[in-house]
């Protein structure tokens, strides 16, 4: 019987030089539009009070001055709760909530994705269903739980609910399903490794882009969170709440409010830049593996 020979042709996708230039120009324009609000916020924080209310408004400060930052620190230091206390509360909420959520979400995601046990699919469907509910809907239930554990009016009342967010669990589970191969885990189990060791030393490095993305998202959300229904004492309020009080001061506090906005914006940007570079580096190195 004669054999039919088939010839395989490689399909090479290529763009013209004009197409590359057009895409580059479009990305540059979009990047400039995304960067302009940050530049404007910094410019506003450096303007003296008379320039803040100048008409027509200027984009850049004509006579830049750091007095707004000085006024901000003086204002916060003369308040009943010092400036450092608001910053400390925000850092504790952001760091504690982020890393606690990362630990629990990745551990539960590993169990749902790579350990076979009865009810795993039902649990994951429950996680998927919970994504449809806004936090406002569950606020009363969360308040009752926090009250039962005597966590009302403490930082734990904000940190612990952040641990229970199901979005990070869903993200980590999906990444582990596609990027962590069962053959690698089975080899580790045959070598006598425990599940907790496999999760930490094998699974977590394989999904590094996922948990770095989770850190960025969770940290920014907690850092920018304002007043909470679980906290009513002034000494446990966050920095975002303090900014709201400064902004409510009106025209005379406009400069200090602009300076506070820059400080509030700076930390998430730094976290994003550091984590984003690690994400790109990790994805680039993982793409070179066989």
Which residue stretches match the model-derived regions?
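A hydrophobic, multi-pass inner-membrane permease signature
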Residues: 2-290
